[in-house]
Amino acid sequence: MLRYIASRAAGMLVVLAIVAVLVFVLTRAASGDPVSVLLGDQATAADIARVQKEYGLDKPLPVQFGYWLREVLQGNLGTSIFLQRPVTQALWERSEPTTLLALMAVAIAALIGVPCGIVSAVFRGRVVDQLFTGIAMLGASIPSFWLGIVLIQIFAVSFGWFPVSGYGAPDAPFAERLHALVLPATVLGLLNSALIIRFTRASMLDVLGEDYVRTARSKGLSESVVVLKHALRNALVPIVTVIGLTVALMIGGAVITETVFGLPGVGNLVVSAVLRRDYPVIQGALLVIAAIYVLINFSIDLLYAVVDPRVKV
């Protein structure tokens, strides 16, 4: 078991190292100069050179990468060029909306996707199966910004049940902040439920064809007991896997939704940083998102090793 954990941990570190290199290279490959954006068109060449030296942007790229990587290994993601404060602080200040949005969205996606996938598998080939399969295909093809605009128009503008945008003041009650996240979480939840529906359906179909399920039915057990106690229990591990990965994908994919709804989350911070060419924020945010994704994937691998005897450790 320890060898299995060590090999997975080593693989995780390799992935993060590759991500760090790619993030740095792609950020620097983008056109534009953060110092020019910061100082404006009236800045002189001397002013630009002075600020570039202050942030180490006058050094060769390999040297810049070495400095940045050394700071990252010490837990320092750098200082934002525009916000003038540590990137870790900026990310922490924006983490609450994004985290709550992802958790609410995955709860909605799971509450919709798992039951629909189970029903679709049980009634394979029937009208309800075709209906849920069609809904899953539709959900996978609808752009999040379009669905967000539609929900805003209906539930925020027409009915006035939810705010059009924003997250509330920092000192606003927690319930008020959650209320502001209902529409964006619904957008992400509905769209990501499509993946969970398809995955749950496929997992349940694999299990429903097993001998022990047929044996349970031959014993006269009710269909609900067969499906929920025998089939779902054995199909649950891969379903939990896709739900866990959905959490990571939502954290990284909330950029568009946060922009549409004007949420002050990490996604909105990244968009602003990209427009300003704020290298430290872009690099730090993407590296943290990648680390969260890799850690969730690592945890799921360990879960597999514990509960699934077919996984060799």
PLM region spans:
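Membrane-water interface segments at the C-terminal ends of transmembrane alpha-helices
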Residues: L22-A29, K59, R70, G134-S165, ...
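Membrane-water interface at transmembrane helix exits
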Residues: V23, T27, S31, V35, ...
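An internal, D/E-rich "acidic patch" concept
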Residues: D58-V114
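Hydrophobic alpha-helical transmembrane segments of membrane transport/permease proteins
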Residues: V15-G66, L83, F159-A180
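Alpha-helical transmembrane segments of integral membrane proteins
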Residues: L2-Y4, L16, L91-V128, S144, ...
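Short hydrophobic, aromatic-rich alpha-helical segments embedded in or entering the lipid bilayer
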Residues: A43-N76, V213, G262-A273
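N-terminal signal-anchor/signal peptide hydrophobic helix marking the start
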Residues: A6-M12
